[in-house]
Amino acid sequence: MPRKGPVPPREIPPDPKYGDVLVQKLINKVMKDGKKSVAEWIVYTALEEAAKEVNMHPVELLHKVIEKLKPEWEVRPTRVGGATYQVPIEVPERRQISLAIKWLVQAARERPRGREQYTMIERLKAELLDALNERGGAYKKKEETHRMAHANMVFSHFRW
């Protein structure tokens, strides 16, 4: 195998409407089967409707939501002498953003399809507003991750 070192992170171009990289990352995560125009429509509509409810700019809303969902700690399994320990580690900034977006979209997709929240637009909008108010599936996932890391702090000396 050639040894050319680590691969540099890929540059993601900003989205066409707001010129923001974070919005583009959300669009890419919502996209299914390469249907980017559908994903753009879902994300833009959900952001605009959610922003209208809280009187904010859509990009500002997304940045606040992602900031609230970013995990600072997570656990990684580490094998030491035949036993596997869940060792808490600090999460790098890039991974924090990736996890926050992943949890947001995952929680929106898993929301029950009721009368008020039938389409993905409505579910994503509801999840954005819930995350802004520190509720919802994505926020619970972050809290659960932090709880796991805090509970396993006794193994933090295995970080190397």
Curated annotation (Swiss-Prot):
The keyword Ribonucleoprotein applies. The gene is rpsG1. HAMAP family: Ribosomal_uS7_B. Belongs to the universal ribosomal protein uS7 family. One of the primary rRNA binding proteins, it binds directly to 16S rRNA where it nucleates assembly of the head domain of the 30S subunit. Is located at the subunit interface close to the decoding center, probably blocks exit of the E-site tRNA. One of its GO terms (molecular function) is mRNA binding. This is Small ribosomal subunit protein uS7A. NCBIfam families: rpsG_bact. Keywords: Ribonucleoprotein, Ribosomal protein, RNA-binding, rRNA-binding, tRNA-binding. The lineage of its organism: Bacteria, Pseudomonadati, Aquificota, Aquificia, Aquificales. The keyword tRNA-binding applies. It holds the Pfam family Ribosomal_S7. One of its GO terms (cellular component) is ribosome. SUPFAM superfamilies: Ribosomal protein S7. Part of the 30S ribosomal subunit. Contacts proteins S9 and S11. InterPro entries: Ribosomal_uS7, Ribosomal_uS7_bac/org-type, Ribosomal_uS7_CS, Ribosomal_uS7_dom, Ribosomal_uS7_dom_sf. One of its GO terms (biological process) is ribosomal small subunit assembly. It comes from the Bacteria. CDD domains: uS7_Bacteria.
